[in-house]
Amino acid sequence: SEMCIRDSQWLNDRGGIEADLTVSRLDETNFHVITSISSLMRDWSYLNDNLMTDPFVEDVTLKFGCLSVQGPNSRMLLQEITDTNLANDEFAFGTGQYSKIANENVWIQKLSYVGELGWEIFIPSEHMLKIYQTIQTQGKKYNLCNVGLHAVNSLRLEKGYRHWGHDIAAEDSLIEAGLSFTAKPDRSDFIGKDAYLTELSKGLPSRRLVQFKLEDPEPLLYHNEPIIMNGEISGYLSSAMYGHSVGSSIGMGYITAENLNQKTLNEANFEIEIATKRYKASSSLKALYDPEGLKMKL
């Protein structure tokens, strides 16, 4: 049976984002908390410092590996090596199930950090190589290839996905980061709730994470470039990369201005400065690629 998965931000008392991670429900009483390896000790400490009850918590990082199979053909490929029905009505986006691949037990969840149809497969470490080779062999006819973090970075930027440490951190709030949809203050209590509700009551923020796309397809962006709004420096890019699906360099960064919403952004004139030269850019609060998020849910 399916169990749900939630993207989650853990806040501090000021409402700042201390962690950005995924919580997967394995069964009625067991959960996986999944974070990036670079944040492991930080998030482990935060979790243990703030537990409200006394559950059993174990770091199983070294016991499991993860293979992420992403792309329009991911369902066809994986369906050939697992008995689990991967059809959309049987395996919805944002859910996970126990499954078997190459006769080994795995946990698979339908999620994507790159904005395409795909599954993340959590595998006991001793079976990683076997399952990797099974996927590679089966994937040849689908032109399966290995991709690195720069490719992932480009794809997640096109989808407007934030990266903790670059785009969101302890001094950034959910509202400033455009992540207030993840907060459910009416459902439960959480650290930073008072700060979040206070900020929410003030209306439109004066600082906001915005996505940018250069009009010129030639210049390259890397991050930290100044954002020019109506002739004045208004912020810096926190992340940037070439966006192959959208045909030019893209980035995101915080800008400071009054009454920030899509209307005020549309009325503003934006440029990004690269090595003292300024290039025109369009701005958006929505993802530059598949803004409705339909491709992941096919």
Walk through the language-model features, giving the residues of each:
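Short, small-residue-biased leader/transition segments that mark boundaries at the very start
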Residues: S1-I5
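Acidic, proline/glycine-enriched N-terminal capping motif
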Residues: R6, L11, G16-E18
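Short, surface-exposed charged micro-motifs
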Residues: D20-T22
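Conserved, structured C-terminal
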Residues: R25-L298
